[in-house]
Amino acid sequence: MIKVRHPVGKGRRIQLVTGRVHPKLAKDISDRLEVPLSDVEVSNFANGEVRLRVNESLRGDDVFIIQAHYGPIHEALFEQLLMIDAAKRASARSITAVCPFLGYARQDRKAGGREPIGARLIIDMLTAAGADRIMSVDLHSGQTQGFFNGPFDHLIAMPIFKRWITENYNPKDIVMVSPDAGRVKMSERYSTSLGTDLAIIHKHRSTTVKNKSEARYLIGDVKGKICMTFDDMIDTAGTITTAAELLLKQGAKEVIALSTHGVFSGPALERLKGSKFSKIVVSDTLPAPANDAGGKIVTLSIAPLIADTIAAIFADESVSALFEGNNQI
């Protein structure tokens, strides 16, 4: 890692600014960089409007504004927009919007007539507020990077998942499983990096019921193997729970879910608790869930990857080198 200390007095400085969504992650990033979090006051007016003030100078500084789009998602997003605007008006040298989880990322295209492209709108809002650069982790699709006319640093959680896998399992016993066609490329990278076999599940999404899909067919041999599925996010957990059942029916010894973003909406935690998964491994791009699904959820820290990327940007070093060139999707 590139060491970046927070100098006193004149000269280029990193400023880490964060809102109310995920203070623990921001603190972990701060500790890794040995750079204190900037003093920011965030509250709400009686009518719900966000009130924000940065209580220290940002003039000439490289400002990194950390905020996952989660919880009351629109308030989280608007907090970040206000922080960006405040930094811009305070004459910051550069402003990077650090969005560990980018809201509306699934709405990256028109799936039907008269539908918006939400991901493009979010990027346009960050741009209009004054962001010079955007950083996010495991986007739903690579095309979202093209919505921004500036540097877009795409991080992947593969290094932390790979470390956890090799510390706890023998790769020879594992089959990496893509839960749908959209995750094949990334699942193949995991498979190649770890030296495991690869299997693919064909998923059918309901045309009549929202947020409902099921695993239909399996391509590949999983008999007697530990299957590890990878997806960018777990939302309602409907798809992956049916995937676990399919894999066990095909002879898998054990099934483990890997997912960068543990969104865990609605019935997700109860579904996972009653599912066939032995473990659900997620990163902490989002705050910890209300419960751990009966002890099944394992959380890994994404802070070192984000901190090292911030350090690389500040030092004008390569970001792709941190991920061995695997951070393109």
Predicted segments, located by residue:
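PRPP-associated nucleotide enzymes
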Residues: 1-329
